Structure formats: structure tokens, C-alpha cells
């Protein structure tokens, strides 16, 4: 059976794993999921990520990060969904928690944070908010 929204599945797996204090979470891999994991690592929300080949199917393993026993990611939510895509121009890119959080945006130059998209002067599809 095919999954209708693999990005929402990825975010839900991360949210659920952090809710039960797991050290890492494993999921099916894709180029977009790896790019999201790279942005999360660059912003300091996860420890590390790795792609492992498991019998012909690539698996993405994400090492979760905690501070003082609490998850570093307090909120992670999908914005643009398959049924309702959300696109923002360069002047309409939202701030998450007045700049304390991050919006991950898919642009023609690849995936990037809201701050980098504003600095670059590009808009795109708002995939998710992380705080």
C-alpha cells in the first residue's frame, strides 16, 4: 500500500519517538526526507542522520536530541499537505515563534530554512514548522 503523505509520516514518527524518549527512529528513506533531516541537523534539532541499505530498501535513521530530559523539538507540524499545498512568495515567508523556530521551505534552489530563503530572496512551498 502506498503512503499518501510520506513527509507527514516522517514528522509523526519523530514526534512519537521523542514522546517516549527513544534515542533514534528508523523510517523508509527518500531524497526529500534526507534533505529535511539535513536541515534539522544543521539547525541543531537532531543529533545525526544516516541512510542504510537494508535488503534493497534504503532506511533513514535519525538520532534524536534531548536537553535536560526534554526533547529539543517541542513542536513539529506539517504545513503544506497533498490536498492543500501552501506556497509563499519571498516577501510572505512566515516566521515561526517570532524567529525562535524554523520553517522548512522547498525552493528552486533546494530545501532551506525560512531565514535562508529570506536572505536568498526566494519563495517556495512551506513544508513544515519546527520549534
Swiss-Prot record:
Coiled coil: none
GO molecular function, one term: structural constituent of ribosome
GO biological process, one term: translation
Annotated keywords: Ribonucleoprotein, Ribosomal protein, RNA-binding, rRNA-binding
GO cellular component: ribonucleoprotein complex; ribosome
Keyword Disulfide bond among record annotations: no
A Pfam family of this chain: Ribosomal_S8
This protein's record includes keyword RNA-binding: yes
PANTHER family: 40S RIBOSOMAL PROTEIN S15A
Function of the protein: One of the primary rRNA binding proteins, it binds directly to 16S rRNA central domain where it helps coordinate assembly of the platform of the 30S subunit.
Family, as annotated: Belongs to the universal ribosomal protein uS8 family.
Quaternary structure and partners: Part of the 30S ribosomal subunit. Contacts proteins S5 and S12.
Protein name: Small ribosomal subunit protein uS8
Originating species: Cupriavidus necator (strain ATCC 17699 / DSM 428 / KCTC 22496 / NCIMB 10442 / H16 / Stanier 337) (Ralstonia eutropha)
Gene field: rpsH
Amino acid at each position: 500500500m502506498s503512503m499518501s503523505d510520506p513527509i507527514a509520516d516522517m514528522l509523526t514518527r519523530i514526534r512519537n519517538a521523542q514522546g517516549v524518549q527513544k534515542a533514534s527512529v528508523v523510517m523508509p528513506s527518500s531524497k526529500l526526507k534526507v534533505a529535511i533531516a539535513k536541515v534539522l541537523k544543521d539547525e541543531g534539532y537532531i543529533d545525526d542522520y544516516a541512510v542504510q541499505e537494508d535488503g534493497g530498501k534504503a532506511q533513514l535513521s535519525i538520532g534524536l536530541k534531548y536537553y535536560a530530559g526534554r526533547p529539543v523539538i517541542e513542536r513539529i507540524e506539517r504545513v503544506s499537505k497533498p490536498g492543500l499545498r501552501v506556497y509563499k512568495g519571498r516577501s510572505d515567508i512566515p516566521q515561526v515563534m517570532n524567529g525562535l523556530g524554523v520553517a522548512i521551505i522547498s525552493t528552486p534552489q533546494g530545501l532551506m530554512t525560512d531565514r535562508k530563503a529570506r536572505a536568498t530572496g526566494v519563495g517556495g512551498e512551506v513544508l513544515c514548522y519546527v520549534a
